C-alpha cells in the first residue's frame, strides 16, 4: 500500500502547471498572403540562402551519405497548377505531369566537398539566369529524395512575396 501512495505522490508532482508564457510584442493575428506567394521546397519561407548556408546544407547532405543533385525549371512550369499541368487519367491515381524539373548534369555521386556543389550551382546560374534552381538530396539505398531547397529564384519572379509582405 505504501508503494501505491508513493507512486501517486510522484504522479502529482509531474502534473504541475507550467508557468504562463508571455505574449509576443506583436500579438496581432496575421493572415498568410495567398496571392503571388508560392513556396518551393524546404527553406522557401527564409530569405535567399548565401553560399555559406548552402555549403552547410551540402555538408549535412554529405554527412548523411546522400547524393546532391541540381535541378532547374522555367517559372511557367516550375509549379503545378491548373494552367500548366497535364492530368493523365487511368495510368495512376493522382498523377500530375510537370512535377519533375530538368536535371543539371548528373547527380553528384561521390561528392565529398561542398565547394564542388557550389561550383555547379554557379555554372547552372550562369547558364540559366532566369530559372528556378533547386538542390535536392537522394538516398541511393532507400531510393528516395530526402531533401530539397531553392538555391536561386529568377530575378523577375512575380509569384514571390518578400518576407515583409507574406503576412497581412
Swiss-Prot record:
Coiled-coil ranges (or none): none
Pfam families referenced in this protein's UniProt entry, alphabetically: RuBisCO_small
InterPro entries: RuBisCO_ssu (IPR024681), RuBisCO_ssu_dom (IPR000894), RuBisCO_ssu_sf (IPR036385)
GO molecular function (one): ribulose-bisphosphate carboxylase activity
Gene3D superfamilies: Ribulose bisphosphate carboxylase, small subunit
CC per GO annotation: chloroplast
Record flagged with keyword Chloroplast: yes
Main subcellular location: plastid
Record keywords: Calvin cycle, Carbon dioxide fixation, Chloroplast, Photorespiration, Photosynthesis, Plastid, Transit peptide
UniProt subunit comment: Heterohexadecamer of 8 large and 8 small subunits.
Note: The basic functional RuBisCO is composed of a large chain homodimer in a 'head-to-tail' conformation. In form I RuBisCO this homodimer is arranged in a barrel-like tetramer with the small subunits forming a tetrameric 'cap' on each end of the 'barrel'.
Function: RuBisCO catalyzes two reactions: the carboxylation of D-ribulose 1,5-bisphosphate, the primary event in carbon dioxide fixation, as well as the oxidative fragmentation of the pentose substrate. Both reactions occur simultaneously and in competition at the same active site. Although the small subunit is not catalytic it is essential for maximal activity.
Protein name listed in UniProt: Ribulose bisphosphate carboxylase small subunit, chloroplastic
Organism of derivation: Chlamydomonas moewusii (Chlamydomonas eugametos)
Gene: RBCS
Amino acid at each position: 500500500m505504501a508503494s501505491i501512495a508513493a507512486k501517486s505522490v510522484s504522479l502529482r508532482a509531474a502534473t504541475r502547471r507550467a508557468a504562463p508564457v508571455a505574449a509576443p510584442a506583436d500579438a496581432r493575428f496575421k493572415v498568410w498572403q495567398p496571392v503571388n506567394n508560392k513556396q518551393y521546397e524546404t527553406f522557401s519561407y527564409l530569405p535567399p540562402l548565401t553560399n555559406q548556408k548552402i555549403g552547410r546544407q551540402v555538408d549535412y547532405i554529405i554527412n548523411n551519405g546522400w547524393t546532391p543533385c541540381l535541378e532547374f525549371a522555367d517559372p511557367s512550369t516550375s509549379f503545378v497548377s491548373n494552367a500548366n499541368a497535364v492530368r493523365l487519367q487511368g495510368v495512376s491515381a493522382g498523377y500530375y505531369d510537370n512535377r519533375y524539373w530538368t536535371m543539371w548534369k548528373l547527380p553528384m555521386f561521390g561528392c565529398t566537398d561542398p565547394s564542388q556543389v557550389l561550383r555547379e550551382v554557379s555554372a547552372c546560374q550562369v547558364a540559366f539566369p532566369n530559372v528556378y534552381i533547386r538542390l535536392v538530396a537522394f538516398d541511393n539505398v532507400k531510393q528516395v529524395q530526402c531533401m530539397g531547397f531553392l538555391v536561386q529564384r529568377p530575378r523577375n519572379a512575380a509569384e514571390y512575396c518578400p518576407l515583409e509582405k507574406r503576412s497581412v
